[in-house]
Amino acid sequence: IGVGGIGKSSYHFTSNDACRLVAVCDVDRNHLDSAVALGRKKFGQKLEAYHDYRDLITDPNVDIVHIATPPHWHGIMAVEAAKAGKDIWCEKPMTRTIGEGKRVVEAVKRNGRIFRLNTWFRFKDTFYGLGTTVEPLKKLVDSGLLGWPLKVTISGATGFAWKFFWVGKENLTPQPVPAELDYDMWLGPAPWKPYNKHRVHATFRGYWDYDGGGLTDMGQHYMDPVQYLLGKDDTSPV
């Protein structure tokens, strides 16, 4: 669900003996058409194309739902997918608020589903630019050789400059909604604001209506591996 950027990344359109892509969904017709064409090219088959996510999660051929929309939709879609009996792979952040996250946890447990949050920095081959995976560092920390307690300093400087493009802007000039975009459906539970292209798609990250700020967006990429290294997956950063 959501095939504009991350949802249409190469690793989502890769053959896998354990599963196959059967359907895509997006409220932007251009994104949807592009994903269908890519699916035909990669797999030689026609993917089901849905405009409304509710139609996708009730498709009997769908077992796992991948949520790759802006975060203001994550909680609602995850709860509805769990209620529909689907397992869920959700992009970060899990939700915009703690309350939404609790509702997702409750729905997943109540319906006996599997939920996977896609926090992939802990799996990177060049962890924090050190030229290694996270596993050797995990073994070093667990060995106790570094002592305890450990202090970890995190910097988001890597690749930071280009992220200024994501910073939200005030007093945006209203623009006509593109014909291919269902803007009302894109907004969904978010407050209505006049359309401006900077508020949608990749640059939605700069607006509190759709995301939770830098820490929940790119910040979690840096905090999540540290949580794992320190054995704190069941806690929250302070």
Question: How should each PLM-predicted stretch be described?
Answer:
Residues 20-22, 147-150, 184, 237:
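A short, local hydrophobic-aromatic micro-motif
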Residues 5, 62, 71, 94, ...:
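Short, flexible loop/turn elements at secondary-structure junctions
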Residues 4, 75, 79, 102, ...:
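A structural signal for well-ordered alpha-helical segments within the folded catalytic domains
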Residues 1-90, 99-115:
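N-terminal glycine-/serine-/threonine-rich beta1-alpha1-beta2 phosphate-ribose binding loop
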Residues 23-25, 66, 150-153, 187:
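Residues embedded in well-ordered beta-strands within globular domains across many folds
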Residues 87-89, 95-182:
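A contiguous active-site-proximal alpha/beta segment in oxidoreductase catalytic domains
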Residues 174-177, 184-238:
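Rossmann-like dinucleotide-binding domain that binds NAD(P)(H)
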Residues 30, 158, 192-193:
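Active-site/binding-pocket entry motifs
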